[in-house]
Amino acid sequence: MTMRRIDLQPLEPFTSDFIDRTGAFNPGALEAATAIIEQVRRDGDAALRALTEKFDGVAIENFRVPGEAIDAAMAEVDPDTLEALKHAAAQIRDFHERQKQQSWFFAREDGAIVGSKVTPLESVGIYVPGGRALYPSTVLMNALPAQVAGVERIVCVTPPTKDGTLDAAILAACKIAGVTEIYTVGGAQAVAALAYGTETIRPVAKITGPGNAFVAAAKKLVSGDVGIDMIAGPSEVCVVADETADPRLVAIDLMAQAEHDPLAACYLVTFSDAYADAVEAAIQVPLADSTRADITRTSLDDHGLIVVCTSMDQALEAVNVIAPEHLEMHVEGAMEYLGAIRNAGAIFLGAWTPEAVGDYVAGPNHTLPTGGTARYSSPLSVDDFVKKRSILLDSQADLLIYGMGERAVVQIATHEGLWAHARSVALRLKALLDAEQASVAGSAAAGVEDGEARGE
């Protein structure tokens, strides 16, 4: 196992040319997902059955998981695993409760009322992947923020195992998170069903959750017809390690990411070739014991990169260019560098904060931007499950009181050539001014008549 290595010279910038990223999907996946979506839109449940048998090798008659199966799963799961899931759920719920935003309204000095109304989405579909591993944690990380946001209908779709059933831990996680609408279907066909509906599955407003290249391609294709959280590519970690870091801990943290997927990307940013050699050597021992050694080795060989820097400033700039999904700072005084880190999905500070803690029980969401998208996007949060609407209220008096503001509308709209925009305000102002003048004239006339009546 050998990771690719780059030794930067003093003041040499790290650029995106050094990064060899694998995209979320390829043209072949996009073409296949297009055909699958069309088939599901045309044939509904029949397409889901045919595609599930084709790709998963099992025949499913009823996709909906019955309530008794969900209840039974709670008894089937190892008690320690069940308690761990409950503990994780409590932490995740607590963290996301702190993200909730309230509607607000503000009465300006000119009398207008403006505000923002926060409303939960009506329905959300959560994709929970299968394949190389089973992910009950994905259920918690997607369902609990939606639940905290107030989403009434939360749907889970996940592919069947080889015997046509679902992992009991995934069902237990659904139960813990309050999800009762669960379907045994995966792949691009599940995304299509969530987006457009079938005889069995009603469509949702938004789809969240990670998946393989075909799922990512399907999410891209349905985006716009429904909302999506993000298009997630292969997972990635970047570890910045100085001479105070234990090479064994750095090594196992790189492996913890590499074991996800042969396409997972692992970056080590350090300050000497000797330390880089020590980390690579430290990988060899646990690799021999790993139950996912082949996946881990392929990931590190094909998508591993060591960047040897000459200064911390150079290292942090490399981090910002990589914009990793996960960033671990195995350096002395890690908190001091937080302000210099602009681009990362999640930041793990210090040697005692491994990524695995964030993946499961710390509370922050593990659904994170990948492939450099941390430059402009954020982790999944309660905000992903609400809508915010702007609220405006003007009265007749407001239009007169801040007439300059309304006349500014006329001025800008006229400049932009939008005649009806300008006219819609000008008509209102004219009507109000005419009414005010009529009222003034009426008052004056009444005053004259009153004076004549008194003989003045």
Regions found by a protein language model. Give the residues of each.
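Conserved NAD(P)+-binding/catalytic subdomain of aldehyde/semialdehyde dehydrogenases
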Residues: G178-L249, D253-A265
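N-terminal Rossmann-like NAD(P)+-binding subdomain of aldehyde/semialdehyde dehydrogenases
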Residues: M1-E122
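C-terminal core of ALDH-fold dehydrogenases
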Residues: V321-S390
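A conserved active-site cap/scaffold subdomain adjacent to cofactor or substrate pockets
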Residues: M230-D302, I306
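Short internal beta-strands
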Residues: E152-K162, C266-D273, V279, G350
